[in-house]
Amino acid sequence: MSSVPAPREYFLDSIRAWLMLLGIPFHISLIYSTHSWHVNSAAPSWWLTLFNDFIHAFRMQVFFVISGYFSYMLFLRYPLKHWWKVRVERVGIPMLTAIPLLTLPQFILLQYVKEKTENWPTLSAYEKYNTLAWELISHLWFLLVLVILTTVSIGIFTWFQKRQETSKPRPAAISLAKLSLIFFLLGVAYAAIRRIIFIVYPAILSDGMFNFIVMQTLFYVPFFILGALAFIHPDLKARFTTPSRGCTLGAAVAFIAYLLNQRYGSGDAWMYETESVITMVMGLWMVNVVFSLGHRLLNFQSARVTYFVNASLFIYLVHHPLTLFFGAYITPHISSNLIGFLCGLIFVMGIALILYEIHLRIPLLKFLFSGKPPVKRESRATIG
């Protein structure tokens, strides 16, 4: 436990908030993309598909690196049990709150929009369970993964801390090239695990809870650990905050490979395994691209930025049902994909900000959507 707080990393706070808020244009562009979603426009847009694919190819990898960085920073600051309790509450309470208040109404809405209400009674018990798992967790999956990673990392972080206490500080003797090789091998290992599961028991890959708890956690744990290592080794963080032409070019090539795999790959062949390798290394390279840009452009304190940093989780939680409502009832009346996309951004962001301001004025909702208990203010005793 450290009594000396680490200096505030404004650029990491800002990047994390921007990555969260990118979920809004990501899901709105999904409506207008060639990808099949809950709701789609009459005619897809190639450039919105490209935009959607680009965000999807790297956003969450970078997010989990930042999560690992801050998680380990707080791990050093608080006792173990308090750290785990606070971290789980901060993500677990908003997730559990959003299920009955957001994703359950969203599920009911989609049942009517997609005219599936009559089919529900005909589903088996497992089909109902699995449908609810996918639909109720929905866009909250990363919160579930964060709870799991926080719990799993107890042993890993404790080991890191003991090594720090018993070993002399020394630079992390690893280059971005070596890291790229490591993450390439991790991508291959993940692809091999998925292929083995596909051969042995393919049905389990369609199970919602297995996907969230096992497959998503396995994929993102290297990025979470990388974030912790970046906090331990300042020189490693410096590699990410220093622009690298190799990482930029590598990310561009990886994205082209990602698009080609999307276009020509087959789900019955090696499409998903290939994608895991590509997005594993692209995620690493985009950490450098995003961190270096963020360090240059966002490393300052601003009341406006702080507002959106604090609001980003709430906005992300409520944007998904708002996006689906827009796609189901407003998109069909807008013929232009560009105008529809821009209207969607204004509609979703505007209502989300209004809801955010309303929830700030209701203490119970403020607690439920943040996981932060209200701060107790001690009254001043009168002297005299």
From Swiss-Prot:
It is an enzyme of class 2 (transferase). Pathway: Glycan metabolism; osmoregulated periplasmic glucan (OPG) biosynthesis. The chain crosses the membrane at residues 17-37, 54-74, 91-111, 140-160, 173-193, 212-232, 240-260, 274-294, 311-331, 338-358. InterPro entries: Acyl_transf_3_dom (IPR002656), Glucan_succinyl_AcylTrfase (IPR050623), Glucans_biosynth_C (IPR023723). Its EC number is 2.1.-.-. It is a multi-pass membrane protein. It comes from the Bacteria. GO terms for biological process: glucan biosynthetic process. It is found in: Cell membrane. Pfam families: Acyl_transf_3 (PF01757). GO terms for cellular component: plasma membrane. Keywords: Acyltransferase, Cell membrane, Membrane, Transferase, Transmembrane, Transmembrane helix. PANTHER family: BLR4337 PROTEIN, GLUCANS BIOSYNTHESIS PROTEIN C. Necessary for the succinyl substitution of periplasmic glucans. Could catalyze the transfer of succinyl residues from the cytoplasmic side of the membrane to the nascent glucan backbones on the periplasmic side of the membrane. This is Glucans biosynthesis protein C. The lineage of its organism: Bacteria, Pseudomonadati, Pseudomonadota, Gammaproteobacteria, Enterobacterales.
